[in-house]
Structures are given as C-alpha cells and as structure tokens.
Amino acid sequence: MYDSPNADMGYDIRDYEKIMSEFGTMEDFDTLLREIHKRDIKLVMDLAVNHSSDEHAWFIESRKSLDNPCRDYYIWRDGKNGKEPNNWSSFFTPSAWSYDEKNRTMVPASVQ
C-alpha cells in the first residue's frame, strides 16, 4: 500500500508517507480511515521497516559518499574474491546481495 516501484511485491518502499497510486490517493486513504472509524473498526497495516527501495530518499543519499550520514542506514559490504560477502540467499533473488556499480561494493539485494 505504501509508495513503491513494486520490484518485490511492494516491500521495496520508496516513500513510507505516500500511498501507491494503484491504491488511490492520500485523500482516499483518509476517507477510508474516517469511514472505518465511524464503524468502530480499527485498521492494522503491515510495515516492512528493515529495508527500502533503491528509490527511497535515504538510499539515494547513502550512495553519494562513504561518509554520508545516511550511509549507515544500509548494510554495505565488500565482496570476497569478486563474489558476495557471504552465502546468504534471498526469497526474491538467488543471492541476498547485489553489486552497486556506483560504490563498487555489495548491498543487500532487497534494496536493489
């Protein structure tokens, strides 16, 4: 439901404060919330906070330099002998890592 380029079924969130256009607008969401509260219904939303999209503002910032304040928001690792830093796998990709050309280092695949 959160704004996402939808590379991994919407878990790659681009903006945690926006609604994905396929689901409507923030005004639509506000209306939904008002209407369900009138009926004494609560809304529980799933939220993946352990990763984001490579289009998220923090990730874009983190790539700018090694000393960027957002750099530590993500896990960056050097590969080993031209390969991934470890053998972790991913649900969405064979490896949990992908190579970031700009930084010449590895970043978890869920971000890329």
PLM regions: where:
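Acidic/aromatic-lined carbohydrate-recognition and catalytic surfaces
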Residues: 1-112
